[in-house]
């Protein structure tokens, strides 16, 4: 029997915090018609689906830290987060479908990259939702400690409000030091 895991990452373009990835093996009982790319679903619906997916799947989260992002670059850090998520699954999948066009370096797994997989493959869509809700909560909680950057709404992405806050308040220890415009402000 084929056991398929879907994998996606979130946070690559953010100026703040770790990059997260999720790996999800869906149970047959889940209604896959509800699953779409996390970016195309409202925040409230994502949270409902997050709970539903967690109850109806085997799932795991992987992340790469700020230090790893700055040392490896964002692409390699994203692939590392994916590898960690796959390895943390409680059941080894026979096939792993990954959103995008790059694959992590991981032995003894059958991997396949799928461009726009988060829009085509339910298990990748589910991984997208798990990763996004998880990361959004972490960054939102950080925003409560680092007021003024509006991370509860922009989740660390380079919105005009966030960039203005950086100019006024400066960078924090949670900003990615190798990312523009952060690297110009050090």
Annotated model-derived regions:
Residues 1-186:
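RNase H-like, Mg2+-dependent phosphodiesterase core
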């Amino acid at each position: 029997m084929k056991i398929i895991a879907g994998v996606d990452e979130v946070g690559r373009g953010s100026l703040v915090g770790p990059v997260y990835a999720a790996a999800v093996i869906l149970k047959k009982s889940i209604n896959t018609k509800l699953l779409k790319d996390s970016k195309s679903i409202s925040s409230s619906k994502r949270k409902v689906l997050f709970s539903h997916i967690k109850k109806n799947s085997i799932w795991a989260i992987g992340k790469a830290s700020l230090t790893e992002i700055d040392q490896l670059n964002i692409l390699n850090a994203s692939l590392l987060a994916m590898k960690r998520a796959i390895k943390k699954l409680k059941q080894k999948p026979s096939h792993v479908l990954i959103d995008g066009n790059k694959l992590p370096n991981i032995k003894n797994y059958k991997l396949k990259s799928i461009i726009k997989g988060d829009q085509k493959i339910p298990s990748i869509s589910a991984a997208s939702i798990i990763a996004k809700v998880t990361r959004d909560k972490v960054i939102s909680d950080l925003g409560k400690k680092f007021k003024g950057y509006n991370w509860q709404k922009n989740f660390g992405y380079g919105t005009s409000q966030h960039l203005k806050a950086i100019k006024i308040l400066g960078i924090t220890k949670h900003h990615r030091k190798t990312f523009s415009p952060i690297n110009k402000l050090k």
